[in-house]
Amino acid sequence: MYKRQIIHCDEFQTEGTDKIAERIKKRVGDNALYLSIDIDVLDPAFAPGTGTPEIAGMTTREIVNVLRGLSGLNLVSADVVEVSPAYDHAEVTSLAAATIVYELTNLFAKS
């Protein structure tokens, strides 16, 4: 059916968020898009409150910039997963997740 395309976090550094957003838009085209964001895509410095923190992840600025660059896609559904309040002592992860949900809501409004 659909082939997945993996974009590694280091590509955000080498290509920049604008080019990554364009790659995603080209790949998706006019198809309906379900976007699932696992919070552990963010570096633990930006999202420590997850069950599986991964070093060398994205920054919050990178994910916000990419989401803003996806305007015009046929976004039909989205979610943010793996936020674990038990590990989120300063609520940094919850704030990052809320910001992502805000940006996703803006995308829905523009779809």
Which residue ranges define each predicted feature?
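Catalytic cores of soluble, metal-dependent hydrolases
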Residues: 5-111
